[in-house]
């Protein structure tokens, strides 16, 4: 298996900062925002966006954690371990994930979040968009576009789990 680093730690940080600035620019009332991190790495990215919003706007935005596994249409798995401690009704919910691929995880996340209320709007922020959509889902905020073949895989590593921030691309040899 061939593995290559395509995004380093500094570029990951810059991508998250860029996403944060775009969120600030595109949302009139930042107090209505709820960041919904999709487990597992999407939660870490959501917390980093939350930190940047605090630094840049002195604003405390809530972060909720979404478990998409019980809502998947391709793989069913156990109980819902989501942590949604905020009423999302009439809020601007921004789903946050590490990689956007087929769109099935995002569809499951939408199914999950609407079970917790009726958001005014749901948008999507992803660190990496790799293409190959199977559903009509498009990200609103993108850190990096990395076109891939279907035989390749994108691996996002985050310091909280993997001891470093980077994005790898792997391909079966």
UniProtKB/Swiss-Prot annotation:
Substrate binds at residues 40-41, 97-105, 130. Its EC number is 2.4.2.9. A motif (PRPP-binding) lies at residues 93-105. GO terms for biological process: DNA-templated transcription termination. It is an enzyme of class 2 (transferase). It catalyses: UMP + diphosphate = 5-phospho-alpha-D-ribose 1-diphosphate + uracil. GO terms for molecular function: RNA binding; uracil phosphoribosyltransferase activity. The keyword NADP does not apply. SUPFAM superfamilies: PRTase-like (SSF53271). Keywords: Glycosyltransferase, RNA-binding, Transcription, Transcription regulation, Transcription termination, Transferase. PANTHER family: BIFUNCTIONAL PROTEIN PYRR. Regulates transcriptional attenuation of the pyrimidine nucleotide (pyr) operon by binding in a uridine-dependent manner to specific sites on pyr mRNA. This disrupts an antiterminator hairpin in the RNA and favors formation of a downstream transcription terminator, leading to a reduced expression of downstream genes. Belongs to the purine/pyrimidine phosphoribosyltransferase family. PyrR subfamily. Homodimer and homohexamer; in equilibrium. This is Bifunctional protein PyrR.
